[in-house]
């Protein structure tokens, strides 16, 4: 079965979030189970730099101007690149300029992505024709609309990685992107008087997926649906919306092969974890104390990620003699808030503003608890990395966090199902209470070791996700 993934990021060449990690791993896992998966994405400078040996598949002019379609390979996966420098030849973030202003021609840049995705199902490459076009997030949302407009030559799947980003543009652009005005309708592309690329993906695809079963439920409610609850609950009722959990790329995120950490370890040989903890404490200039419970947080500093909850309850970690290390960047007031914590408690709390891939790996490997107190979290990858590395996730019960972490209670520890710590309400008090429970378990080294073992034995491999997607494709 020939699968075309249509997306706008690919790890490690270009990444702004978890979407890139998924596309860096899922197609490869699908090929390993016998599917024929390829990827289509814009030829951004970072992508061209990483995929240099390409051949021209097609050259044409359309609503977006002059376009060359190239084909190459990366990590054993076939990659199509849309080479249109007037649209994609911009360094840095693929969606906005250095001042965080969205590019004014995004409607055209991502319409072209969807258009080429549909054309690859109708013979644009005479040697390979997609049977399933699998589009990811709003950037690729128009794929399904173009396929619909061509009489549905292939099956279509749309994956929601984050419903908060919808890709809404003025309806005046409709005639510029080659779609008939009849599709601008509440039973079509229209949302709140604008074209919604995200809604297009949901409405016109044969099936949609969310990146966890709980998130697939949550987005049918007004709180999480951003005005799309009617459409989403309808899809759910028809069996056209399902949740499939993301996996972990074990070539990159596994404590026994991780190229970024100084000391490898595995379930049967954990000595390296203690050594990584000492290295991490040294990096952050915190006391190298093996007995101090070390909390780590690697995150965007936003309200979605629950950073404010942590700022208000972090003194609990200090009070109990623990340590807290944070890596991330984001809203200036949150950056300031965590800097102030580190200044107030220099023996217990340390912060690095920014992003550092190598440090993020050391934090996951060297920490004892990884904090993910998100208000909402479609899937979440950091808690999965924590499980893999025996760094117990402390999470809020939402989205993929609810699907992947089992709270440590006396019953669940005894039943060997506990894998971390879970709190329900998005309040500093609830987080504080959960921190207290983590300290209580830390005082029982044998119980802690049991939970850590059970966490590390969880299977969140991409192979598992690849099998679930195959089952979905086969029933379309």
From Swiss-Prot:
Keyword terms of this UniProt record: Glycogen biosynthesis, Glycosyltransferase, Transferase
Q: Which GO biological-process labels does this protein carry?
A: glycogen biosynthetic process
Recorded GO molecular functions are: alpha-1,4-glucan glucosyltransferase (ADP-glucose donor) activity; alpha-1,4-glucan glucosyltransferase (UDP-glucose donor) activity
Instruction: Please state what the protein is called.
Output: Glycogen synthase
Where along the chain is ADP-alpha-D-glucose bound? 15
GO CC aspect terms: cytosol
Enzymatic reactions: [(1->4)-alpha-D-glucosyl](n) + ADP-alpha-D-glucose = [(1->4)-alpha-D-glucosyl](n+1) + ADP + H(+)
The beginning of the lineage is: Bacteria, Pseudomonadati, Pseudomonadota, Gammaproteobacteria, Pasteurellales
What this protein is reported to do is described as:
Synthesizes alpha-1,4-glucan chains using ADP-glucose.
Originating species: Haemophilus influenzae (strain 86-028NP)
